[in-house]
């Protein structure tokens, strides 16, 4: 882990938001 939990979470959210989907929302849609 080279990132703090906050930094990593923000990095993931930023990537997902760029595609127009949030991690939780995407999981709910695919579930």
Swiss-Prot record:
Coiled coil: none
Subunit structure: Heterohexamer; disulfide linked. Contains 2 sets of 3 non-identical chains (alpha, beta and gamma). The 2 heterotrimers are in head to head conformation with the N-termini in a small central domain.
Biased composition (Acidic residues): 1-10
Region called Disordered, residue ranges: 1-31
Cell location: Secreted
Record's function text: Cleaved by the protease thrombin to yield monomers which, together with fibrinogen alpha (FGA) and fibrinogen gamma (FGG), polymerize to form an insoluble fibrin matrix. Fibrin has a major function in hemostasis as one of the primary components of blood clots. In addition, functions during the early stages of wound repair to stabilize the lesion and guide cell migration during re-epithelialization. Was originally thought to be essential for platelet aggregation, based on in vitro studies using anticoagulated blood.
Name of protein: Fibrinogen beta chain
Residues recorded with modification Sulfotyrosine: 2-3
Domains: entry comment: A long coiled coil structure formed by 3 polypeptide chains connects the central nodule to the C-terminal domains (distal nodules). The long C-terminal ends of the alpha chains fold back, contributing a fourth strand to the coiled coil structure.
Biological process (GO), any one: innate immune response
Cellular compartments per GO CC: extracellular region
Ranges annotated as biased composition (Basic and acidic residues): 18-31
Free-text description of this protein's post-translational modifications in UniProt: Conversion of fibrinogen to fibrin is triggered by thrombin, which cleaves fibrinopeptides A and B from alpha and beta chains, and thus exposes the N-terminal polymerization sites responsible for the formation of the soft clot.
Coiled coil found in the keyword field: yes
Organism: Canis lupus familiaris (Dog)
Keyword S-adenosyl-L-methionine: no
Main location group: secreted
Assigned keywords, A-Z: Adaptive immunity, Blood coagulation, Coiled coil, Disulfide bond, Hemostasis, Immunity, Innate immunity, Secreted, Sulfation
Gene coding for it: FGB
